[in-house]
């Protein structure tokens, strides 16, 4: 999947996620084959937060590339301490800007293979169903979406 295609798809998923009435959800964009290479958008009680290199449940964290630290800092991310992740509460509400920020954070932080197919994971079942519909609408095909959930 090329960056423009991935960002358009991500915008559709973000539109559904941000419109959700639920609080306390997470939406994780990750790179298949690179465990721990991810960006998590979450909506805790304090507002929206982005975390680069969050890790996921029992998966090991993947430290971001040292060359990415300047880019992350320039884009409002802080961290890199004991856990090695970077986070920001300065989350753009424009869908195109948010999709680009998430995609660029993965590109700078983890250098995934060019044209990688992103995967999403979420903690809100309604988002999974709605995201599948957004993916199908975008792709105009009837394949499953690589979205994972847990209970």
Model-inferred region functions:
Residues 1-151:
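Structured alpha/beta or helical-core interaction and ligand-binding surfaces enriched in interleaved
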